[in-house]
Amino acid sequence: MMNLIPKTNFDFLKIRKYFYAVSAIILIAGLICILTRGLNMGIDFKGGTMVQVQFTESITIDQVRSAVEKYNPEIQSYVGKNTYMIKIKGSQENVNEVRSDVETSLTAAKLKFTVVATDFVGPTVGKDLGERALWALALSLVFMVLYIAFRFQNIIWGTAGVIALIHDAFFMVAAFAFLQKEFDLVIVAALLTAVGYSINDNIVIFDRMRENIKENPKESFYNIVNRSLNETLSRTVITGSTVLIVLVIIYFFGGEVLKNFSLIMLIGVIVGTYSTLFIATPIVYDWAKDSDNFAKTVGNQDVALAAEIKTAKKHNKKKHR
Protein backbone atom coordinates (compact mmCIF):
# COMPACT_ATOMS: atom_id res chain seq x y z
CA MET A 1 0.00 0.00 0.00
CA MET A 2 1.44 3.35 -1.03
CA ASN A 3 2.14 5.79 1.79
CA LEU A 4 0.72 9.24 1.15
CA ILE A 5 3.19 10.58 3.72
CA PRO A 6 6.89 10.05 2.85
CA LYS A 7 9.05 7.98 5.19
CA THR A 8 9.82 10.09 8.25
CA ASN A 9 12.47 9.98 10.95
CA PHE A 10 11.21 12.36 13.64
CA ASP A 11 12.72 12.11 17.10
CA PHE A 12 9.43 12.17 19.04
CA LEU A 13 11.02 11.23 22.36
CA LYS A 14 13.49 14.11 22.25
CA ILE A 15 10.66 16.66 22.52
CA ARG A 16 8.34 14.63 24.77
CA LYS A 17 8.92 16.75 27.88
CA TYR A 18 7.86 19.90 26.05
CA PHE A 19 4.56 18.25 25.19
CA TYR A 20 4.17 17.00 28.76
CA ALA A 21 4.45 20.65 29.80
CA VAL A 22 2.00 21.82 27.11
CA SER A 23 -0.57 19.24 28.21
CA ALA A 24 -0.09 20.14 31.87
CA ILE A 25 -0.67 23.85 31.15
CA ILE A 26 -3.78 23.14 29.04
CA LEU A 27 -5.22 20.75 31.63
CA ILE A 28 -4.67 23.25 34.47
CA ALA A 29 -6.36 25.95 32.37
CA GLY A 30 -9.18 23.49 31.66
CA LEU A 31 -9.63 22.73 35.36
CA ILE A 32 -9.81 26.44 36.15
CA CYS A 33 -12.39 26.86 33.37
CA ILE A 34 -14.54 24.00 34.72
CA LEU A 35 -14.37 25.35 38.28
CA THR A 36 -15.13 28.96 37.32
CA ARG A 37 -17.55 28.60 34.38
CA GLY A 38 -18.94 25.15 35.08
CA LEU A 39 -20.65 22.85 32.60
CA ASN A 40 -23.84 23.89 30.84
CA MET A 41 -25.80 20.81 31.90
CA GLY A 42 -28.64 19.71 29.65
CA ILE A 43 -32.10 18.64 30.74
CA ASP A 44 -30.86 15.03 31.13
CA PHE A 45 -28.81 16.12 34.14
CA LYS A 46 -30.40 19.37 35.32
CA GLY A 47 -34.09 18.58 34.95
CA GLY A 48 -36.90 20.31 33.08
CA THR A 49 -40.23 19.98 31.28
CA MET A 50 -40.95 17.49 28.50
CA VAL A 51 -43.86 18.26 26.16
CA GLN A 52 -44.87 15.44 23.80
CA VAL A 53 -46.55 16.83 20.69
CA GLN A 54 -48.22 14.98 17.81
CA PHE A 55 -48.72 16.82 14.51
CA THR A 56 -51.61 16.17 12.13
CA GLU A 57 -49.43 16.82 9.09
CA SER A 58 -45.96 15.62 8.14
CA ILE A 59 -43.35 17.95 9.64
CA THR A 60 -39.57 18.01 10.00
CA ILE A 61 -37.61 18.37 13.22
CA ASP A 62 -36.13 21.62 11.88
CA GLN A 63 -39.61 23.13 11.55
CA VAL A 64 -40.38 22.22 15.16
CA ARG A 65 -37.05 23.60 16.33
CA SER A 66 -37.58 26.83 14.40
CA ALA A 67 -40.95 27.35 16.10
CA VAL A 68 -39.64 26.97 19.67
CA GLU A 69 -35.95 27.87 19.27
CA LYS A 70 -36.15 30.84 21.69
CA TYR A 71 -36.53 28.33 24.56
CA ASN A 72 -33.27 26.57 23.60
CA PRO A 73 -34.99 23.15 23.52
CA GLU A 74 -33.80 19.59 23.04
CA ILE A 75 -36.04 17.84 20.51
CA GLN A 76 -36.47 14.11 20.05
CA SER A 77 -38.44 12.56 17.18
CA TYR A 78 -40.43 9.32 17.14
CA VAL A 79 -39.95 7.43 13.88
CA GLY A 80 -43.11 7.01 11.81
CA LYS A 81 -45.42 8.67 14.35
CA ASN A 82 -45.03 12.34 13.38
CA THR A 83 -44.55 12.94 17.11
CA TYR A 84 -41.86 14.97 18.85
CA MET A 85 -40.68 15.34 22.43
CA ILE A 86 -39.78 18.95 23.21
CA LYS A 87 -37.52 19.25 26.28
CA ILE A 88 -36.98 22.62 27.96
CA LYS A 89 -34.95 23.32 31.10
CA GLY A 90 -36.82 24.75 34.09
CA SER A 91 -38.26 24.06 37.53
CA GLN A 92 -41.35 21.99 38.36
CA GLU A 93 -43.32 25.14 39.17
CA ASN A 94 -42.99 26.27 35.54
CA VAL A 95 -44.39 23.11 33.89
CA ASN A 96 -47.76 24.63 32.93
CA GLU A 97 -46.12 27.85 31.82
CA VAL A 98 -43.67 25.96 29.59
CA ARG A 99 -46.51 23.93 28.06
CA SER A 100 -48.47 27.11 27.36
CA ASP A 101 -45.42 28.78 25.77
CA VAL A 102 -44.83 25.76 23.53
CA GLU A 103 -48.48 25.71 22.43
CA THR A 104 -48.40 29.45 21.71
CA SER A 105 -45.19 29.18 19.65
CA LEU A 106 -46.39 26.21 17.61
CA THR A 107 -49.73 27.92 16.93
CA ALA A 108 -47.93 31.10 15.85
CA ALA A 109 -45.95 28.98 13.39
CA LYS A 110 -49.29 27.80 11.94
CA LEU A 111 -48.68 24.16 12.81
CA LYS A 112 -51.56 21.78 13.53
CA PHE A 113 -50.85 19.67 16.60
CA THR A 114 -52.09 17.99 19.76
CA VAL A 115 -50.23 17.94 23.07
CA VAL A 116 -50.13 14.24 24.02
CA ALA A 117 -48.42 14.53 27.41
CA THR A 118 -46.47 16.88 29.66
CA ASP A 119 -43.97 15.56 32.21
CA PHE A 120 -41.25 16.91 34.47
CA VAL A 121 -37.80 15.35 34.83
CA GLY A 122 -36.46 16.28 38.25
CA PRO A 123 -32.84 16.88 39.30
CA THR A 124 -32.89 13.56 41.20
CA VAL A 125 -33.28 11.69 37.92
CA GLY A 126 -30.60 13.90 36.40
CA LYS A 127 -28.25 13.09 39.28
CA ASP A 128 -28.86 9.37 38.78
CA LEU A 129 -28.13 9.69 35.06
CA GLY A 130 -24.94 11.63 35.84
CA GLU A 131 -23.74 8.93 38.22
CA ARG A 132 -24.46 6.25 35.63
CA ALA A 133 -22.53 8.21 33.01
CA LEU A 134 -19.52 8.45 35.34
CA TRP A 135 -19.74 4.73 36.06
CA ALA A 136 -19.88 3.98 32.34
CA LEU A 137 -16.74 6.05 31.75
CA ALA A 138 -14.91 4.55 34.75
CA LEU A 139 -15.78 0.96 33.82
CA SER A 140 -14.74 1.51 30.20
CA LEU A 141 -11.34 2.78 31.38
CA VAL A 142 -10.87 -0.19 33.76
CA PHE A 143 -11.71 -2.76 31.08
CA MET A 144 -9.40 -1.01 28.61
CA VAL A 145 -6.51 -1.27 31.11
CA LEU A 146 -7.23 -4.97 31.67
CA TYR A 147 -7.56 -5.69 27.95
CA ILE A 148 -4.30 -3.95 27.00
CA ALA A 149 -2.46 -5.44 29.99
CA PHE A 150 -3.64 -8.93 28.96
CA ARG A 151 -2.85 -8.40 25.29
CA PHE A 152 0.64 -7.00 25.90
CA GLN A 153 1.37 -9.03 29.04
CA ASN A 154 2.31 -5.95 31.05
CA ILE A 155 0.32 -3.36 33.01
CA ILE A 156 2.56 -0.51 31.79
CA TRP A 157 1.00 -0.48 28.31
CA GLY A 158 -2.56 -0.40 29.65
CA THR A 159 -1.89 2.22 32.31
CA ALA A 160 -0.11 4.52 29.85
CA GLY A 161 -3.01 4.18 27.44
CA VAL A 162 -5.60 5.02 30.09
CA ILE A 163 -3.58 8.02 31.35
CA ALA A 164 -3.78 9.33 27.78
CA LEU A 165 -7.53 8.60 27.66
CA ILE A 166 -8.16 10.50 30.90
CA HIS A 167 -6.11 13.34 29.39
CA ASP A 168 -8.33 13.27 26.27
CA ALA A 169 -11.63 13.02 28.16
CA PHE A 170 -10.71 15.87 30.50
CA PHE A 171 -9.67 18.04 27.56
CA MET A 172 -13.03 17.44 25.82
CA VAL A 173 -15.03 18.24 28.96
CA ALA A 174 -12.94 21.38 29.55
CA ALA A 175 -13.52 22.50 25.95
CA PHE A 176 -17.29 22.21 26.44
CA ALA A 177 -17.03 24.16 29.70
CA PHE A 178 -15.13 26.90 27.87
CA LEU A 179 -17.57 26.99 24.92
CA GLN A 180 -20.59 26.61 27.26
CA LYS A 181 -22.11 24.05 24.93
CA GLU A 182 -24.90 21.94 26.39
CA PHE A 183 -23.63 18.80 28.10
CA ASP A 184 -26.13 15.91 27.94
CA LEU A 185 -26.27 12.14 27.46
CA VAL A 186 -25.54 12.50 23.73
CA ILE A 187 -22.27 14.19 24.65
CA VAL A 188 -21.46 11.39 27.10
CA ALA A 189 -21.97 8.90 24.24
CA ALA A 190 -19.69 10.99 22.00
CA LEU A 191 -17.11 11.16 24.79
CA LEU A 192 -17.01 7.35 25.08
CA THR A 193 -16.83 7.02 21.28
CA ALA A 194 -13.87 9.41 21.07
CA VAL A 195 -12.13 7.58 23.91
CA GLY A 196 -12.60 4.29 22.02
CA TYR A 197 -11.11 5.85 18.89
CA SER A 198 -8.11 7.12 20.85
CA ILE A 199 -7.33 3.77 22.50
CA ASN A 200 -7.46 2.08 19.09
CA ASP A 201 -4.75 4.46 17.87
CA ASN A 202 -2.65 3.65 20.94
CA ILE A 203 -3.01 -0.11 20.43
CA VAL A 204 -1.83 0.15 16.81
CA ILE A 205 1.39 1.88 17.88
CA PHE A 206 1.90 -0.36 20.94
CA ASP A 207 1.52 -3.41 18.70
CA ARG A 208 4.11 -2.07 16.27
CA MET A 209 6.48 -1.42 19.18
CA ARG A 210 6.03 -4.98 20.42
CA GLU A 211 6.72 -6.43 16.95
CA ASN A 212 9.82 -4.27 16.53
CA ILE A 213 11.07 -5.36 19.96
CA LYS A 214 10.70 -9.04 18.97
CA GLU A 215 12.39 -8.53 15.60
CA ASN A 216 15.23 -6.36 16.97
CA PRO A 217 15.83 -7.39 20.62
CA LYS A 218 19.27 -5.75 20.67
CA GLU A 219 18.14 -2.40 19.28
CA SER A 220 17.86 0.53 21.68
CA PHE A 221 14.35 0.87 23.13
CA TYR A 222 14.62 4.62 22.47
CA ASN A 223 15.14 3.93 18.76
CA ILE A 224 12.40 1.28 18.68
CA VAL A 225 9.83 3.69 20.12
CA ASN A 226 10.78 6.45 17.68
CA ARG A 227 10.83 4.04 14.74
CA SER A 228 7.44 2.60 15.67
CA LEU A 229 5.91 6.08 15.86
CA ASN A 230 7.39 7.01 12.48
CA GLU A 231 6.29 3.74 10.84
CA THR A 232 2.69 4.25 11.96
CA LEU A 233 2.62 8.02 11.44
CA SER A 234 1.15 7.77 7.93
CA ARG A 235 -1.65 5.51 9.15
CA THR A 236 -2.33 7.73 12.19
CA VAL A 237 -2.53 10.95 10.17
CA ILE A 238 -4.54 9.53 7.25
CA THR A 239 -7.07 7.77 9.51
CA GLY A 240 -7.44 10.87 11.69
CA SER A 241 -7.84 13.15 8.66
CA THR A 242 -10.49 10.90 7.11
CA VAL A 243 -12.52 10.86 10.33
CA LEU A 244 -12.13 14.64 10.70
CA ILE A 245 -13.45 15.25 7.17
CA VAL A 246 -16.56 13.18 7.93
CA LEU A 247 -17.11 14.97 11.25
CA VAL A 248 -16.73 18.42 9.67
CA ILE A 249 -19.37 17.48 7.07
CA ILE A 250 -21.71 16.24 9.84
CA TYR A 251 -21.11 19.42 11.85
CA PHE A 252 -22.07 21.76 9.01
CA PHE A 253 -24.70 19.67 7.21
CA GLY A 254 -25.99 17.15 9.77
CA GLY A 255 -28.49 19.48 11.38
CA GLU A 256 -28.76 20.95 14.85
CA VAL A 257 -29.25 17.57 16.55
CA LEU A 258 -25.80 16.29 15.54
CA LYS A 259 -23.91 19.58 15.93
CA ASN A 260 -22.67 19.12 19.50
CA PHE A 261 -22.05 15.40 18.98
CA SER A 262 -19.82 16.06 15.96
CA LEU A 263 -18.11 18.98 17.73
CA ILE A 264 -16.97 16.94 20.73
CA MET A 265 -15.94 14.13 18.38
CA LEU A 266 -13.86 16.62 16.38
CA ILE A 267 -12.12 17.76 19.55
CA GLY A 268 -11.69 14.15 20.68
CA VAL A 269 -10.11 12.93 17.43
CA ILE A 270 -7.65 15.85 17.33
CA VAL A 271 -6.67 15.49 20.99
CA GLY A 272 -6.61 11.68 20.72
CA THR A 273 -4.18 11.78 17.79
CA TYR A 274 -2.00 14.26 19.68
CA SER A 275 -1.97 12.17 22.88
CA THR A 276 -1.16 8.97 20.98
CA LEU A 277 1.98 10.52 19.50
CA PHE A 278 3.14 12.76 22.32
CA ILE A 279 1.65 11.43 25.57
CA ALA A 280 0.77 7.70 25.65
CA THR A 281 3.81 6.27 23.85
CA PRO A 282 6.37 8.54 25.56
CA ILE A 283 4.84 7.55 28.93
CA VAL A 284 5.47 3.88 28.05
CA TYR A 285 9.10 4.75 27.32
CA ASP A 286 9.68 6.82 30.46
CA TRP A 287 8.03 4.25 32.70
CA ALA A 288 9.38 1.13 31.02
CA LYS A 289 13.04 2.13 30.95
CA ASP A 290 13.18 1.86 34.75
CA SER A 291 10.97 -1.21 35.15
CA ASP A 292 12.45 -4.64 35.96
CA ASN A 293 9.14 -6.33 35.11
CA PHE A 294 8.92 -4.67 31.71
CA ALA A 295 12.49 -5.73 30.92
CA LYS A 296 11.61 -9.34 31.65
CA THR A 297 8.51 -9.11 29.46
CA VAL A 298 10.03 -7.55 26.33
CA GLY A 299 13.66 -8.63 26.79
CA ASN A 300 14.91 -5.45 25.14
CA GLN A 301 18.59 -4.59 25.60
CA ASP A 302 18.51 -1.04 26.96
CA VAL A 303 15.35 -1.65 29.01
CA ALA A 304 16.98 -4.70 30.58
CA LEU A 305 20.18 -2.71 31.14
CA ALA A 306 18.22 0.08 32.86
CA ALA A 307 16.60 -2.52 35.09
CA GLU A 308 20.01 -4.02 35.96
CA ILE A 309 21.39 -0.57 36.83
CA LYS A 310 18.34 0.14 38.97
CA THR A 311 18.78 -3.19 40.81
CA ALA A 312 22.50 -2.52 41.29
CA LYS A 313 21.77 0.91 42.78
CA LYS A 314 19.33 -0.64 45.26
CA HIS A 315 21.94 -3.27 46.19
CA ASN A 316 24.63 -0.61 46.73
CA LYS A 317 22.31 1.45 48.94
CA LYS A 318 21.63 -1.58 51.14
CA LYS A 319 25.35 -2.41 51.25
CA HIS A 320 26.34 1.05 52.50
CA ARG A 321 23.69 1.27 55.22
UniProtKB/Swiss-Prot annotation:
Q: Which keywords label this protein?
A: Cell inner membrane, Cell membrane, Membrane, Protein transport, Translocation, Transmembrane, Transmembrane helix, Transport
Has keyword Nucleotide-binding?
no
Q: Which domain of life is it from?
A: Bacteria
Localization of this protein: Cell inner membrane
The reply to whether Membrane figures as a keyword in the UniProt entry is yes
Segments passing through the bilayer: 19-39, 133-153, 159-179, 186-206, 237-257, 264-284
Q: Which GO terms describe its molecular function?
A: protein-transporting ATPase activity
Q: Name one GO cellular component term.
A: plasma membrane
- Quote the subunit structure annotation: Forms a complex with SecD. Part of the essential Sec protein translocation apparatus which comprises SecA, SecYEG and auxiliary proteins SecDF. Other proteins may also be involved.
List the NCBIfam families hit by this protein, alphabetically.
2A0604s01 (TIGR00916), transloc_SecF (TIGR00966)
Q: What is this protein called?
A: Protein translocase subunit SecF
The root-end lineage is: Bacteria, Pseudomonadati, Elusimicrobiota, Elusimicrobia, Elusimicrobiales
